[in-house]
Amino acid sequence: DVVMTQTPLSLPVSLGDQASISCRSSQSLVHSNGNTYLNWYLQKAGQSPKLLIYKVSNRFSGVPDRFSGSGSGTDFTLKISRVEAEDLGIYFCSQTTHVPPTFGGGTKLEIKR
């Protein structure tokens, strides 16, 4: 199975800061059809994960443009340009290029104390 490694595990930020989360896969996520099926999700407390970004850099419907995804091959990044309170939670990367689909361990975005 493809191993997805996220860093950092915890990301303390102040509101208005930029946040950056990295995701690395154990093998290339470029599909034979040329697409790269790397997705980002946000799970808020008590809720199921919600899709933010699909195929590396495409924002899902309704996702604010302060969220952006980039990367290729095995290395990917999610950036939040100005963190808002509603952005707090656990972020996951996932790949659906290979079977079975696999997820990173999560990055908790929290307020810096």
Swiss-Prot record:
Q: Which InterPro entries match?
A: Ig-like_dom, Ig-like_dom_sf, Ig-like_fold, Ig_sub, Ig_V-set, IgV_Light_Chain
Start and end residues of each stretch annotated as Complementarity-determining-1: 24-39
User: Which parts of this chain are annotated as the region Complementarity-determining-3?
Assistant: 94-102
Q: Which UniProt keywords apply?
A: Adaptive immunity, Disulfide bond, Hybridoma, Immunity, Immunoglobulin, Monoclonal antibody
Please name the SMART domains in this protein's record. IG, IGv
Q: Name one GO biological process term.
A: adaptive immune response
Q: Where is this region: Complementarity-determining-2?
A: 55-61
According to the UniProt record, which cysteines are disulfide-bonded? C23-C93
Which Pfam family would be a valid example here? V-set
Which GO-annotated molecular functions does the record name?
A: antigen binding
* Annotated stretches, region: Framework-3: 62-93
Region annotated Framework-2 sits at 40-54
- Framework-4, as annotated region: 103-112
Can you name this protein? Ig kappa chain V-II region 26-10
GO CC annotations on file:
immunoglobulin complex
Region (Framework-1) location: 1-23
Further comment found in the protein's record: This chain was isolated from an IgG2a hybridoma protein that binds digoxin.
